C-alpha cells in the first residue's frame, strides 16, 4: 500500500511538473502568436500604405502590390539615370573651336577680364570663401583702428 501511495505521489508530482511545463510552453506560444499577429497587422498596414502609393485603384493583394512597387522602383531608377546623364557626361576630346562656340566671351557676356579669373579656375573652390588677410584688413594689423572715430 505504501508503495502504491508513493508511486501515486510521484505520478502527481510528475503531472504537476508536466502541467507546469506545458502551461509555460502554452504561455510562450500565446506570446508568440500575439507578437506574430502584431507583426502580421503591421505588415498588412504597410502593404496597404504601399498600395495607396503605387496603384491606388488597382489590385489590393499583397503579391500584386509588391510587384507594382518593384516596377515603380525600377522606373524611378531609370528616371534618375536619364535625368542625371547630362550632368555625368564629359566632353570627349572637344576641339578649341567647338568649345569657343559655348564661350561667354564670344557672346559678349564675359564681365570680368580673363586674367583675373586664373586664380579661381585653378583653385579647389574651398579657398574662395576664406577670409583674405591684407594690410588693410583688421585681422592683419595688430592694433586695429576704426575708420569711424
Swiss-Prot record:
Gene3D superfamilies named in the record: Helix-loop-helix DNA-binding domain (4.10.280.10)
GO CC field: nucleus
Domain bHLH: 27-76
Keyword Membrane assigned: no
Entry keywords, A to Z: DNA-binding, Nucleus, Transcription, Transcription regulation
Gene Ontology molecular-function annotations: DNA binding; DNA-binding transcription factor activity; protein dimerization activity
Cellular compartments annotated: Nucleus
Listed InterPro entries: bHLH95_bHLH, bHLH_dom, HLH_DNA-bd_sf, IND-like
PANTHER family, A to Z: TRANSCRIPTION FACTOR BHLH153 (PTHR16223:SF204), TRANSCRIPTION FACTOR BHLH83-RELATED (PTHR16223)
Family affiliation: Belongs to the bHLH protein family.
Protein name: Transcription factor bHLH153
Higher taxonomy: Eukaryota, Viridiplantae, Streptophyta, Embryophyta, Tracheophyta
Protein encoded by which gene: BHLH153
Amino acid at each position: 500500500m505504501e508503495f502504491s501511495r508513493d508511486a501515486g505521489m510521484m505520478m502527481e508530482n510528475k503531472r504537476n511538473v508536466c502541467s507546469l511545463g506545458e502551461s509555460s510552453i502554452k504561455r510562450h506560444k500565446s506570446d508568440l502568436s500575439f507578437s506574430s499577429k502584431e507583426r502580421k497587422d503591421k505588415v498588412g498596414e504597410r502593404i496597404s500604405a504601399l498600395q495607396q502609393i503605387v496603384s491606388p485603384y488597382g489590385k489590393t493583394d499583397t503579391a500584386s502590390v509588391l510587384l507594382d512597387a518593384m516596377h515603380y522602383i525600377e522606373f524611378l531608377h531609370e528616371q534618375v539615370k536619364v535625368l542625371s546623364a547630362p550632368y555625368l557626361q564629359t566632353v570627349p576630346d572637344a576641339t578649341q573651336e567647338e568649345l569657343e562656340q559655348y564661350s561667354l566671351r564670344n557672346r559678349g557676356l564675359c564681365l570680368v577680364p580673363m586674367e583675373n579669373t586664373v586664380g579661381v579656375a585653378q583653385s579647389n573652390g574651398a579657398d574662395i570663401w576664406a577670409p583674405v588677410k591684407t594690410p588693410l584688413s583688421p585681422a592683419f594689423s595688430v592694433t586695429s583702428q576704426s575708420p569711424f572715430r
